[in-house]
């Protein structure tokens, strides 16, 4: 057989939309250009578009970070439900404000890791799709509505929620970097 390696696939893509052939842009990352090109040639379609990057750490970090920040943005949806009722119609200001702050913080974190700008953009696109169509949206809304962590976890029993693990781990890392004088906690209000 042929030995090929792709380190990660990331970007704004939900499987159910891919099944319907919705236009989708993702990135494949790895160190071997020939392997990446082969995968792109093999898997690209008229609706599944693939960018390539050698920035493995940047891409993997971007797609992980989006989970933590999507949780925070989704919580604003729950807050609106709690204060105005679930049938109050669409409220975008708080979501947009939280999304803006999430993008700023993600960019700062990715710069610390020397991620490429392309990986930043992939992470931002992934943040968008996760806020509006992912599992993280569900837990964020429940927490924003005032459910306790335990209540929300009971409601979503059996659902994998990377966002909670990522948020805790990234916050812990930021606190440590702040102790070392490498970052200011004021730059990361959504995490601290």
Regions found by a protein language model. Give the residues of each.
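NAD(P)-dependent Rossmann-like dehydrogenase/reductase catalytic/cofactor-binding core
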Residues: 53-56, 60, 66, 71-81, ...
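Rossmann-fold dinucleotide-binding core
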Residues: 1-92
């Amino acid at each position: 057989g042929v030995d090929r390696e792709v380190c990660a696939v990331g970007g704004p893509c939900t499987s159910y939309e891919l099944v319907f052939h919705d236009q989708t842009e993702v990135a494949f990352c790895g160190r071997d250009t020939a392997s990446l090109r082969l995968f792109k040639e093999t898997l690209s379609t008229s609706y599944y578009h693939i960018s390539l990057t050698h920035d493995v750490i940047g891409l993997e970090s971007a797609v992980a970070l989006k989970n933590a920040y999507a949780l925070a943005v989704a919580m604003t949806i729950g807050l609106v439900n709690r204060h105005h009722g679930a049938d109050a119609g669409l409220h975008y200001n708080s979501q947009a404000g939280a999304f803006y702050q999430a993008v700023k913080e993600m960019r700062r974190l990715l710069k610390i890791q020397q991620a490429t700008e392309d990986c930043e953009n992939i992470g931002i696109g992934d943040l968008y799709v996760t806020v509006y169509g992912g599992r993280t949206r569900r837990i964020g809304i429940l927490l924003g509505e005032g459910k306790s962590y335990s209540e929300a976890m009971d409601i979503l029993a059996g659902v994998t929620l990377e966002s909670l693990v990522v948020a805790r781990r990234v916050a812990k890392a930021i606190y440590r970097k702040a102790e070392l004088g490498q970052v200011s906690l004021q730059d990361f209000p959504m995490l601290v």
